[in-house]
Amino acid sequence: MIEAKDRLIDKMLESGAILFGHFVLSSGKESDYYINVKKVVTDPDALELMAGLIAGLVQRVGIDFDRVAGPELGAVPIATAVSLKTGKPLVIVRKKPKGYGTGSQIEGDVKEGDRILLVEDVTTTGGSVLRAAEVLESLGARIAAIAVVVDREEGAEGSITSKGYTFLPVIRVSELLERKETVKGRESD
């Protein structure tokens, strides 16, 4: 698992998924760095690593689930890869209900009592993924766990666990930044 995690971090660094400068995050917070996992989900090897790491983490912790869900847009490819890896059906959670057709806020089937593994690309405060959890729970589903590729370590874990959810970060930003410094140090030798 550690080797796969390091390979994923390396792919993130190589793809330019970590940017430095001034950014406003979806939470409204300002940051001097931005993690754009969307830059790396277009790499099939990185996507496979993400799916394998999430599936392995969930299995090790002993989480049982019936479906994999991801909020649009960033988590959809990751949730799809986890769905393929685990053989569990996929559910996509829209930010807002469609303004046409059925007006649904989800794509895919959710039944009363379904245990959902909710997947997210990056968490800061946890607000976006918690809104997705509310949508799924309003349909009678239960959140088995929330797995995230990168946790920025800015409050998401506390927000998510305070609601009673199991929080499973694959990579914490401190690990990512530490790896960046290690790689940078090797390159300057």
UniProtKB/Swiss-Prot annotation:
<comment type="similarity">
    <text>Belongs to the purine/pyrimidine phosphoribosyltransferase family. PyrE subfamily.</text>
</comment>
<dbReference type="InterPro" id="IPR023031">
    <property type="entry name" value="OPRT"/>
</dbReference>
<keyword id="KW-0808">Transferase</keyword>
<feature type="binding site" description="in other chain">
    <location>
        <position position="95"/>
    </location>
    <ligand>
        <name>5-phospho-alpha-D-ribose 1-diphosphate</name>
    </ligand>
</feature>
<protein>
    <recommendedName>
        <fullName>Orotate phosphoribosyltransferase</fullName>
        <ecNumber>2.4.2.10</ecNumber>
    </recommendedName>
</protein>
<keyword id="KW-0328">Glycosyltransferase</keyword>
<keyword id="KW-0665">Pyrimidine biosynthesis</keyword>
<dbReference type="InterPro" id="IPR029057">
    <property type="entry name" value="PRTase-like"/>
</dbReference>
<dbReference type="GO" id="GO:0004588">
    <property type="term" value="F:orotate phosphoribosyltransferase activity"/>
</dbReference>
<keyword id="KW-0460">Magnesium</keyword>
<dbReference type="GO" id="GO:0000287">
    <property type="term" value="F:magnesium ion binding"/>
</dbReference>
<feature type="binding site">
    <location>
        <position position="98"/>
    </location>
    <ligand>
        <name>5-phospho-alpha-D-ribose 1-diphosphate</name>
    </ligand>
</feature>
<dbReference type="InterPro" id="IPR000836">
    <property type="entry name" value="PRibTrfase_dom"/>
</dbReference>
<comment type="function">
    <text>Catalyzes the transfer of a ribosyl phosphate group from 5-phosphoribose 1-diphosphate to orotate, leading to the formation of orotidine monophosphate (OMP).</text>
</comment>
<feature type="binding site">
    <location>
        <position position="124"/>
    </location>
    <ligand>
        <name>orotate</name>
    </ligand>
</feature>
<dbReference type="GO" id="GO:0044205">
    <property type="term" value="P:'de novo' UMP biosynthetic process"/>
</dbReference>
<feature type="binding site">
    <location>
        <position position="152"/>
    </location>
    <ligand>
        <name>orotate</name>
    </ligand>
</feature>
<feature type="binding site" description="in other chain">
    <location>
        <begin position="120"/>
        <end position="128"/>
    </location>
    <ligand>
        <name>5-phospho-alpha-D-ribose 1-diphosphate</name>
    </ligand>
</feature>
<dbReference type="InterPro" id="IPR004467">
    <property type="entry name" value="Or_phspho_trans_dom"/>
</dbReference>
<dbReference type="GO" id="GO:0019856">
    <property type="term" value="P:pyrimidine nucleobase biosynthetic process"/>
</dbReference>
<feature type="binding site">
    <location>
        <position position="94"/>
    </location>
    <ligand>
        <name>5-phospho-alpha-D-ribose 1-diphosphate</name>
    </ligand>
</feature>
<comment type="pathway">
    <text>Pyrimidine metabolism; UMP biosynthesis via de novo pathway; UMP from orotate: step 1/2.</text>
</comment>
<dbReference type="Pfam" id="PF00156">
    <property type="entry name" value="Pribosyltran"/>
</dbReference>
<comment type="subunit">
    <text>Homodimer.</text>
</comment>
